[in-house]
Curated annotation (Swiss-Prot):
Keyword terms, alphabetized: Cytoplasm, Methylation, mRNA processing, mRNA splicing, Nucleus, RNA-binding
Biased composition (Polar residues): 70-87, 100-113
Organism whose genome encodes this protein: Pongo abelii
SMART domains in the cross-refs: RRM (SM00360)
Gene that encodes the chain: RBFOX1
PANTHER family recorded: ATAXIN 2-BINDING PROTEIN 1-RELATED, RNA BINDING PROTEIN FOX-1 HOMOLOG 1
Name this protein carries in UniProt: RNA binding protein fox-1 homolog 1
Length: 382
């Protein structure tokens, strides 16, 4: 019974709680019909009741949970609306350049259309000339230039037409491309820029050599013997170094300068061949009396020419013409020689072979077969 009473008491106490709970809600319902402001002030009254805080918190939380959810829901549309507004703003910003671009593009197009344009016309009849091509394209607009490419045999079958206005050029290209003129299908295309290639500079010498005087004297001795050695000898002012007036040397000889053979022209110095001279060189000139006593260094371009000195004068000599008719002769290598004025005073000289060279002056041959001779002093008498 006691337990039942306690349960009843507990039930009575629990039943009393809803009555008290109903009062604050009932009191709070009167204010909202007038204004929203009294409700805000009447709502705090139930909160101070300490006995029902545990029970009232749940409905309060439930009540408070809805407004925040509503506020969040209200804020989210605002945010979305703000986002949409900002998005539209960005779109309008982006749209502004797009609106401006069509304005700039027509100006660029008009500028391009007003510029000259060149067309490449190919497969045109070979009898066509510039007036014919101008007449064909002149109906589409003003033409600045017409050019048909020719070679030594005539027209090459293509040319160029330059219009003052690029729009006229485009219209002419569309109309005339693929048309048949005198049995030939004409092709009209936009001319492309030429690709400029680096052409080799033209060398003043026809053989393509551009050497310094030392190396050039080896590979082109006659040129430097005429322009360097003899000019230097004439500048000395001495009779023993003077060159004969019959020798003609020009500095404009192209490449290997082998001019026409004259009576006294001997570029290889035939009067010195086989004499046992101190230093043999390609700097030798003709055979004037007295002979030139000084010669430069000793490198021969070809081994065959160097070998004839060791073989002796008689071993190398060819059949000499008579003194009355002796002018000049040339061997099979294109070298021009004059008749030796001293051959009547010379006997066959086998002693001027290799054995006649002093010790320590044996010939040395490089990879070109060139021979170096340094047997006697630089200067010697005749």
């Amino acid at each position: 019974m006691n337990c039942e009473r306690e349960q009843l008491r507990g039930n009575q106490e629990a039943a009393a709680a809803p009555d008290t709970m109903a009062q604050p809600y009932a009191s709070a319902q009167f204010a909202p019909p007038q204004n929203g402001i009294p409700a805000e002030y009447t709502a705090p009254h139930p909160h101070p009741a300490p006995e029902y805080t545990g029970q009232t918190t749940v409905p309060e939380h439930t009540l408070n949970l809805y407004p925040p959810a509503q506020t969040h829901s209200e804020q989210s549309p605002a945010d979305t609306s703000a986002q949409t507004v900002s998005g539209t703003a960005t779109q309008t910003d982006d749209a502004a350049p797009t609106d401006g671009q069509p304005q700039t593009q027509p100006s660029e197009n008009t500028e391009n259309k007003s510029q000259p344009k060149r067309l490449h016309v190919s497969n045109i009849p070979f009898r066509f000339r510039d007036p014919d091509l101008r007449q064909m394209f002149g109906q589409f607009g003003k033409i600045l230039d017409v050019e048909i490419i020719f070679n030594e045999r005539g027209s090459k079958g293509f040319g160029f037409v330059t219009f003052e206005n690029s729009a006229d050029a485009d219209r002419a290209r569309e109309k005339l491309h693929g048309t048949v003129v005198e049995g030939r299908k004409i092709e009209v295309n936009n001319a492309t820029a030429r690709v400029m290639t680096n052409k080799k500079t033209v060398n003043p010498y026809t053989n393509g050599w551009k050497l310094n005087p030392v190396v050039g004297a080896v590979y082109s001795p006659e040129f430097y013997a005429g322009t360097v050695l003899l000019c230097q000898a004439n500048q000395e002012g001495s009779s023993m170094y003077s060159a004969p007036s019959s020798l003609v040397y020009t500095s404009a000889m192209p490449g290997f300068p082998y001019p026409a053979a004259t009576a006294a022209a001997a570029y290889r110095g035939a009067h010195l061949r086989g004499r046992g001279r101190t230093v043999y060189n390609t700097f030798r000139a003709a055979a004037p009396p007295p002979p030139i006593p000084a010669y430069g260094g000793v490198v021969y371009q070809d081994g065959f020419y160097g070998a004839d000195i060791y073989g002796g004068y008689a071993a190398y000599r060819y059949a000499q013409p008579t003194p009355a008719t002796a002018a000049a002769y040339s061997d099979s290598y294109g070298r021009v020689y004059a008749a030796d004025p001293y051959h009547h005073a010379l006997a066959p000289a086998p002693t001027y072979g290799v054995g006649a060279m002093p010790q320590g002056s044996s010939p040395s041959t490089d990879f070109r077969g060139a021979k170096l001779h340094t047997s006697r002093p630089l200067l010697s008498g005749s």
